[in-house]
């Protein structure tokens, strides 16, 4: 059985390490659909090492319309994912609770939770 992994936040250190481990010695029909946001250059070495097994997508998960467009592209151009790994997050900013940033919190919630729900609804079987 061919595995297709959909990995959001794939350009993170964790995402790239996971992709390396998944594709190292994997069957040739293994495919990773890797989402990043403005930083796909980080995937260049993996794309070179695993030609045909890694497709990259530059998608801003904080924008619901872009998330919806992304799942439409996946539905049209990629096999249905057998696995979904959701890793995106804003960079950590340590701050005192007194300096809590509601706007940043809402943005992170959109990226980490709302996008996951929208993508899962689109790619997981009913």
Describe every region a protein language model picked out.
Residues 89-106:
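Conserved mid-core segment of classical short-chain dehydrogenase/reductases
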Residues 8, 81-89, 112:
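Rossmann-fold scaffold of SDR-type NAD(P)-dependent oxidoreductases
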Residues 62-77:
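Conserved Rossmann-fold cofactor-binding substructure of NAD(P)-dependent oxidoreductases
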Residues 62, 100, 107-115:
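Glycine-rich NAD(P)-binding loop of the Rossmann-fold in SDR/ketoreductase-type enzymes
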Residues 11, 15-20:
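N-terminal Rossmann NAD(P)H-binding glycine-rich loop of SDR-like oxidoreductase domains
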Residues 47-65:
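Rossmann-fold cofactor-recognition segment
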Residues 19-20, 76, 111-126:
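Amphipathic alpha-helical dimer-interface segment in Rossmann-like NAD(P)H-dependent oxidoreductases
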